[in-house]
């Protein structure tokens, strides 16, 4: 039984191709339903995100190859003018399992260790299950992938350390102040970067965040989303700088929103209580001379990127541990796949001996008492289990270089004179 994976991702195709081939949830359901209903696949699942669209298919006929599935997806998206087969990757058998394990454990992500992908794989499995496209193989594959991801998260540090500017800023603030719930925070700028930083702050138990933005309604909307309910008019935030322990700037401007003179006055009002300023703007939002002030800690994007680079280096050092977990699970998954291949022979073998047993017992049904017949049934069942134990164990055993599943199946079928499947 084969399982094929084909798709595009950040390694194989530029973003415009990934966008063109991506599937919405509605399209996802339609696509895999088409594959199943047309008799092309027994099972199917699609993982579709901004960085990847990947098919996982158990084909129902030999004609359904990796190349066939590439063309099928291109045709479904009516993208023949833009998308070519060389934009795709292909994986087969255990290669497919390895790929999904790597994706789920976040070592195939655009950002190493970015854990969001696991939730997206779970969504893909949910969608496939909802349209009855996830059978025994994809179900086992996905649940093994989820188990791999859990082990990777708990047994390695591949997901530790900030690898985004906004998150690095928040981690740095936490290292300096430890308990963010006791600190008052000013966010200057309610755009995407500022919003991310504020949300990361909330995740670290920050409870007192005040937001200011040129467009007051945008600041109010973010404050409501965060649950802080606190905003300052952009024209007046400088009057309150002395009240804040942490200041985050994330605005698009060519002029500094914080200068040395005003921060000097603020520090005098604070009686030199420490302040962290996290400048997430590009160009810089904060006068770099501010760093000369006593108890003033200023970090800009370059400083934060240095932290990110060190964290990424640490994550890369965890890769051998992650690969070891994946290899261990691949062996178990491969052994399970082998049991699927021998299952029909095991069923046929058991059925044949049960049939023999029933025929022989039937001959004595009216020659012995009911009690004696029950004893005979119990005895013959025990004998059958012992007779069949070794051949079944041999069929399920891990394969080595001198053996193969087909040769074992043929051997057992010949010895016990079993008919070929589907005859």
Curated annotation (Swiss-Prot):
The active site is at residue 50. Transmembrane segments: none annotated. Pathway: Porphyrin-containing compound metabolism; protoporphyrin-IX biosynthesis; 5-aminolevulinate from L-glutamyl-tRNA(Glu): step 1/2; Porphyrin-containing compound metabolism; chlorophyll biosynthesis. InterPro entries: 4pyrrol_synth_GluRdtase, 4pyrrol_synth_GluRdtase_dimer, 4pyrrol_synth_GluRdtase_N, GluRdtase_CS, GluRdtase_dimer_dom_sf, GluRdtase_N_sf, NAD(P)-bd_dom_sf, Shikm_DH/Glu-tRNA_Rdtase. One of its GO terms (biological process) is protoporphyrinogen IX biosynthetic process from glutamate. It comes from the Bacteria. SUPFAM superfamilies: Glutamyl tRNA-reductase catalytic, N-terminal domain, Glutamyl tRNA-reductase dimerization domain, NAD(P)-binding Rossmann-fold domains. The keyword NADP applies. Homodimer. Belongs to the glutamyl-tRNA reductase family. NCBIfam families: hemA. This is Glutamyl-tRNA reductase. The lineage of its organism: Bacteria, Pseudomonadati, Chlorobiota, Chlorobiia, Chlorobiales.
């Amino acid at each position: 039984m084969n399982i094929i994976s084909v798709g595009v991702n950040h390694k194989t195709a530029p973003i415009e191709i990934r966008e063109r081939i991506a599937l919405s949830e509605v399209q996802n359901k339609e696509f895999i339903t088409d594959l199943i209903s047309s008799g092309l696949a027994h099972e199917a699942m699609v993982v579709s995100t901004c960085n990847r669209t990947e098919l996982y298919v158990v084909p129902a006929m030999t004609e359904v190859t990796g190349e066939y599935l590439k063309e099928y997806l291109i045709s479904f998206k009516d993208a023949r003018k833009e998308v070519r087969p060389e934009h795709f990757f292909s994986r087969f058998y255990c290669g497919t399992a390895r790929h999904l394990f790597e994706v789920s454990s976040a070592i195939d992500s655009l950002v190493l260790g970015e854990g969001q992908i696991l939730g997206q794989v779970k969504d893909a499995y949910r969608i496939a299950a909802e349209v009855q496209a996830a059978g025994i193989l994809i179900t086992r594959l996905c649940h093994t992938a989820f188990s791999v991801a859990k082990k990777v998260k708990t047994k390695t540090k591949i997901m530790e350390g900030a690898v985004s500017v906004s998150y690095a800023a928040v981690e740095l603030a936490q290292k300096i102040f430890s308990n963010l719930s006791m600190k008052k925070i000013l966010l200057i700028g309610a755009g995407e970067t500022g919003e991310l930083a504020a949300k990361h702050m909330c995740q670290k138990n920050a409870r007192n965040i005040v937001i200011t933005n040129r467009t007051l309604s945008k600041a109010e909307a973010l404050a409501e989303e965060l649950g802080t309910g606190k905003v300052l008019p952009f024209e007046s935030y400088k009057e309150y700088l002395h009240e804040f322990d942490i200041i985050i700037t994330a605005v698009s401007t060519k002029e500094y929103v914080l200068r040395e003179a005003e921060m000097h006055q603020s520090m005098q009002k604070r009686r030199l209580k420490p302040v962290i300023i996290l400048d997430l703007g590009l160009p810089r939002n904060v006068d770099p001379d501010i760093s000369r002030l006593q108890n003033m800690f200023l970090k800009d994007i370059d400083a934060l990127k240095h932290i990110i680079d060190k964290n990424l280096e640490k994550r890369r050092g965890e890769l051998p541990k992650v690969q070891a977990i994946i290899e261990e699970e691949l062996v178990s998954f491969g052994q399970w796949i082998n049991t699927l291949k021998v299952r029909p022979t095991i069923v046929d073998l058991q059925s044949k001996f049960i049939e023999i047993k029933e025929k022989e017992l039937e001959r004595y049904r009216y020659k012995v008492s009911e009690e004696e017949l029950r004893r005979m049934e119990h005895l013959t069942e025990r004998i059958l289990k012992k007779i069949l134990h070794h051949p079944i164990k041999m069929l399920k055993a891990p394969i080595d270089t001198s053996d193969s599943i087909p040769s074992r199946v043929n051997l057992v079928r010949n010895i016990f004179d079993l008919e070929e499947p589907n005859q």
